[in-house]
Amino acid sequence: IFCTICTIQAKDRVIERPPFLAWSSNSIEIDKIVMSDTVTTVYIKAFYRPKYWIKIATGSFLKDNNGMLYPIRKGVGITLDKEFWMPESGEAEFQLLFPPIPENVTSLDFSEGDFDGAYKIWGIQLDKDTFYKQKLPKEAVVHKINKKAILPTPKLAFGTATLKGKI
């Protein structure tokens, strides 16, 4: 009798620089998402003023296109609910760990919760082919557009202006 034992290791699904529909802040962006059968790892790049801090809340979660919620498990390179001080460069990287996401999920929303200043990223695409079929969520629209509003007539005038920035 001949027995063959086969073990099949599931291959991780990797989404590099996933497109998204909208975000509440450009201080954090998703560099990569790695989905395995045990954990979903979201690789974050942070951009903020040097020597100032950012924070990721313990109430953070992912919400899939089917409405299922996946609460954050922990941070790697960042401690949840603690001030993360930005280095002199103003750029940093860390990971956020979540429960595994089913393979049939095509998009995710990231949210820290519903409070002032919460980081939110809507419509993170796991399948780039469906990106242009997505609609912007209602909570992502902050300003209503008045299509009947008339813009003022442009005019040249003397005055004082201040321009701040980096070159």
Predicted regions and their residues:
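A short, amphipathic beta-strand motif
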Residues: 163-167
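Low-complexity, acidic Ser/Thr/Pro/Gly-rich terminal tails and inter-domain linkers that flank the onset
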Residues: 12-37, 66-78
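The feature marks short-to-medium sequence segments in extracytoplasmic or secretory-pathway proteins
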Residues: 47-87
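Short, solvent-exposed, Trp/other aromatic-anchored flexible loops in extracytoplasmic proteins
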Residues: 71-108, 112-115
